[in-house]
Amino acid sequence: ENLQPLGGRAPEDDTSDERELRALFSTIEAERDAARAKAQRVVLIDLHSTSADGGAFSVVPDSIPSRRLARDIGLPVILGLEERIEGPLLTWLVSQGDTATVIEGGQHDAPRTQEVLRDGLWVALSHVGVLPEHDERVDRARVLMRSSCDDVPGVLDLVYAHVIDGETGFQMDSGWSNFMPVALGQRLA
């Protein structure tokens, strides 16, 4: 989520989405502060699905604990994507010294998406010590997570993103999904 609109504005000027975001942010801050008061580790797993078809992946900020968590979850990790998003929650949390990762589970209505998100949580719970490393649910989740992305490298670095203006009428050609190899000069849209 983009936290930037909340900065410097009075709550009474918020849109309904901003009010919801402000309430969520307030809850996260309160939980984080309560955990810190007990000297507990703070970890955020931000679960998402997309409108587009494609494989699951993790997004992490530039933080070693966050990257370790994302790698343990077992999905491809995309480095640099969080830098293209304005004001993401995970970047803010990591700047506060906490651990955070996004799990992008897949397309909204795809049956596998819920499984990926659930399995990612099982592995994350084990990673932070809430569940034992060899819990049956965690073992099963690790196998399923890794099998869902066999043909994709474990870590990818986003080096270029072409911004598309909504006014251009841009339309991708059918048949493409994330992580598909593209040859130089090959038509995409």
List the model feature ranges, each with a label:
Residues 1-189:
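Structured catalytic-domain cores with a bias toward divalent-metal coordination
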